[in-house]
Amino acid sequence: MSLQPLTAVNCGSLVQPGFSLLDLEGDVYLFGQKGWPKRSCPTGIFGVRIKKGELKLRAISFSNNSSYLPPLRCPAIAHFEAQDGKPECYLIHGGRTPNNELSSSLYMLSVDSRGCNRKVTLRCEEKELVGDVPSARYGHTLSVINSRGKTACVLFGGRSYMPPTERTTQNWNSVGDCPPQVYLIDLEFGCCTAHTLPELTDGQSFHVALARQDCVYFLGGHILSSDCRPSRLIRLHVELLLGSPVLTCTILHEGLTITSAIASPIGYHEYIIFGGYQSETQKRMECTYVGLDDVGVHMESREPPQWTSEISHSRTWFGGSLGKGTALVAIPSEGNPTPPEAYHFYQVSFQKEQDGEATAQGCSQESTDFEDSAPLEDSEELYFGREPHELEYSSDVEGDTYNEEDEEDESQTGYWIKCCLSCQVDPNIWEPYYSTELTRPAMIFCSRGEGGHWVHAQCMELPESLLLQLSQDNSKYFCLDHGGLPKQEMTPPKQMLPVKRVPMKMTHRKAPVSLKMTPAKKTFLRRLFD
């Protein structure tokens, strides 16, 4: 085992606890970014690239017929292998949005197309569920099982908000364990059935679920009602019979006391379990090998990598599996002054390094690294023994890598800034305060200072009526740090210069005809018409 520090290249602000890593068709994608997606990556999904000790993210696009997928923290993730003409995909259920709303939708994420110019397009499909639909939750697990030629999903555990009838202003954000029911989801028709087993008496969350054929094993977990982490192992056997499924549950007591752990696959139904917590204030620093076969579960302790002092002394850590026996671990940055990067990243490897990297193309007199070669035009690009999609990350192009410096500067007009020393707006736990707010907090402009600055109306303790009044008239506002007077000066009205109206001249207008007549003719004509 080895531990390698990584340097996040202009992407550290996107990572947050509760994110997910998806190993799809040989590529790894990051899902569940911090905050709502921005213009540079509206999908909120990034391709993960680790090379030469650097962590880079690349924005991924969706196909035109894709459904909207919000960024979700702590969802249930399941990998669906390609079978019966169906492509390889990931199933995503539940999770928390940046507004702390819980999702009850089921999404299917797959690769739609690959281009020769290193571009991957994903397709997201929202699956409609009917029957006993699982409620919105987070911290649960989703597993794919195969029994008697059929495929289904097993959903178990999680936390959710209190029922609407019991939810008040005081306990609005209070959560509890979901009922200990097991849900079976038919992926073809979206039918859901709930099953209550006598062996499962308490709900749990943040456990590890490992599936093999028609069995699912639940390791660890946290029971919120009793605030305990039982060291038990739950074996769930599912038979998808023609009439109704049969579920058999067995409770074993040789499990692990662990929550929020990372399961990194190292072989066929072989995993390394590490990370997470064994108590409220203690991380679990050990590594455990878990193997699944026809007999059952085999667990062995493995020597962990040599953790750094930053990891050992950090109170929290999180991460995800990169596939192929590797994982990504992040810890919060600590120090005085505060480091510019919010997190430190490490790559953990559980497999022995090979003597040399196998390359599909190379020459003894030339470099085998594709980054050392000048990029070819599309018309002259040649592939020797390689598929076009295998060159997906063969080179790093400046324009293809996500750079948070390319985003709009939100230091002055951003919604999630720290507007004052007592700022109450946290993008992770923010909820609408005013009736006019939907996805962003209401802000008001303070006219004091060099160029003025924006502050949150909630932090300034502005009543909603006064906020609406200030937004409708032309009054200046000064924040609490600059006097705290809602109305002190009136913005002078804009002086409008009078418009000078110049009469228009007609270009083709003719002067009236003047007749020269003698007085005798005038007298004759006057008598004639009289």
UniProtKB/Swiss-Prot annotation:
Keywords: Chromatin regulator, DNA recombination, Metal-binding, Nucleus, Zinc, Zinc-finger. GO terms for biological process: B cell differentiation; hematopoietic or lymphoid organ development; immunoglobulin V(D)J recombination; lymphocyte differentiation; protein-DNA complex assembly; T cell differentiation; T cell differentiation in thymus; thymus development. Disulfide bonds: none annotated. It is found in: Nucleus. It comes from the Eukaryota. Zn(2+) 1 binds at residues 419, 423, 456, 459. Core component of the RAG complex, a multiprotein complex that mediates the DNA cleavage phase during V(D)J recombination. V(D)J recombination assembles a diverse repertoire of immunoglobulin and T-cell receptor genes in developing B and T lymphocytes through rearrangement of different V (variable), in some cases D (diversity), and J (joining) gene segments. The atypical PHD-type zinc finger recognizes and binds histone H3 trimethylated on 'Lys-4' (H3K4me3). The atypical PHD-type zinc finger also binds various phosphoinositides. This is V(D)J recombination-activating protein 2. It comes from Danio rerio.
